[in-house]
Amino acid sequence: MSAALRFDNIGKVFPGVRALDGISFDVHAGEVHGLMGENGAGKSTLLKILGGEYQPDAGSVLVDGQPVHFSSAAASIAAGIAVIHQELQYVPDLTVAENLLLGRLPNALGWVKKGEAKRHVRERLTAMGVDLDPDAKLGRLSIAQRQMVEICKALMRNARVIALDEPTSSLSHRETEVLFKLVDDLRAQGRALIYISHRMDEIYRLCDACTIFRDGRKIASHESLADVPREQLVAEMVGREISDIYHYAPRALGDVRFSAEGVDGPALREPASFSVRAGEIVGFFGLVGAGRSELMRLVYGADRRRAGELTLDGKRIDVKRTGDAIRHGIVLCPEDRKEEGIIAMASVAENINISCRRHSLRAGLFIDRKTEIETADRFIQRLKIKTPNRRQKIRFLSGGNQQKAILSRWLAEPDLKVVILDEPTRGIDVGAKHEIYDVIYRLAERGCAIVMVSSELPEVLGVSDRIVVMREGRIAGELARAQANEHAVLSLALPQTSVAEAA
């Protein structure tokens, strides 16, 4: 049986980096083919070739046995290919319906038939089991909702080959189950799917076959995962065995370093209070929409607080904007690193130095380039940031390496006291997670107070000294590490269970 999609000896080179080297594998109709590898292994680059964003320097792509060359994304779409990237592509000021039908809006004599467009979109969303308002502006939706729109857009094009790059990274459990059903339905319809994920549970739940990348090369292809243990996939991905990804070790904790009392804002149902000791890692867990990120933005000054007091080392501080927080040694690594974390057109070195630049000014006026170069090189080496050089534009780095650069930005701060990490390992492979946990522990050992927001319950349980659980815009409860387990945390997080019952 000929493959619906074949990659034949694909090669791609960027300045100083061989991103893909001799990649060959097949994807068949009615098959979900998993693609795994560390960040920077070349998975997303391959999808960009499939989607017409990049052209291969060697090899060829075959669809239904015929060689194809996509000079643009439009050419790929016209050939029945749909690629859903980790970096979402949407127009924030347009509605859900307008984004889904962009370029295909029904019209009469040049006038868009909005009623027909909304009706069509509503019918398709209902059929897919997706609960979204067709009139809602994309820019006002959550990241999870925007991701569902991207997935729906591909499905509405009736593509024969669909590639999904970390599609559940921002989805709730219910939304993930909706996606899984869609994938199962598409497989049953005979479509060919590529599914990139770092989550082993998803790979084993969805995929019929799996290919492993490492450093731009194919390490292995498995036609069936039935007899392949998870440990083997991890070893193939990272080139080494990782027995305990979290490697938690108790550490001495100091006095309360930071506290928030009665913090309130539009996204919260009731005022929230919490504290963090010096050297402590407090994990914040909750379902999508629980208000964790919103609470952190209020504390950091990114959004305006209606009420609440912040205390640092026993003294009340006034934080009305992010600059105030940074001056007090409080920093936040945001959930959406593409929009709020990195400066995409700047170099790796500039992204690392942007926050601490005020410390490298000579005579208060001139940037000390020598100091900045030394700082960038030190953190590139210490955090193992994969980049050809410090001058490389950060947008060309993988998600894991971008995240390491953002963490380097704050590690370079000499007066760092409080670090808020919002989904620090989202979309990052198991090897990079291991390294980022090392960074978090290093910050805690420096005496920093760490707040880690995460949707991955095993991560929260594995890394945190204490866990705060949020539910529907309020703090539902708190658990010490010794008391915490999946049942106890989920009992507090799930809407149908009261705090009293969970206790």
UniProtKB/Swiss-Prot annotation:
Binding site for ATP: G37, E38, N39, G40, A41, G42, K43, S44
InterPro entries xref list: AAA+_ATPase, ABC_carbohydrate_import_ATPase, ABC_transporter-like_ATP-bd, ABC_transporter-like_CS, P-loop_NTPase
UniProt similarity note: Belongs to the ABC transporter superfamily. Arabinose importer (TC 3.A.1.2.2) family.
Predominant cellular place of this UniProt entry's protein: membrane
Name of the gene: araG1
Keyword vocabulary terms for this entry: ATP-binding, Cell inner membrane, Cell membrane, Membrane, Nucleotide-binding, Repeat, Sugar transport, Translocase, Transport
Summary of the function given for this chain in its UniProt record: Part of the ABC transporter complex AraFGH involved in arabinose import. Responsible for energy coupling to the transport system.
Membrane topology according to the record: Peripheral membrane protein
Domain ABC transporter: 5-240, 251-497
Cell compartment(s), UniProt: Cell inner membrane
Protein's recorded name: Arabinose import ATP-binding protein AraG 1
EC number of this enzyme: 7.5.2.12
Organism, as annotated: Burkholderia ambifaria (strain ATCC BAA-244 / DSM 16087 / CCUG 44356 / LMG 19182 / AMMD)
Gene Ontology, cellular component aspect: plasma membrane
Lineage of the organism: Bacteria, Pseudomonadati, Pseudomonadota, Betaproteobacteria, Burkholderiales
Transmembrane domains' residue ranges: none
Complex formation: The complex is composed of two ATP-binding proteins (AraG), two transmembrane proteins (AraH) and a solute-binding protein (AraF).
Leading EC class: translocase
PANTHER family with a match to the protein in the record: ARABINOSE IMPORT ATP-BINDING PROTEIN ARAG, CARBOHYDRATE TRANSPORT ATP-BINDING PROTEIN MG119-RELATED
Source superkingdom: Bacteria
Catalytically driven reaction(s): L-arabinose(out) + ATP + H2O = L-arabinose(in) + ADP + phosphate + H(+)
A molecular function (GO) term: ATP binding
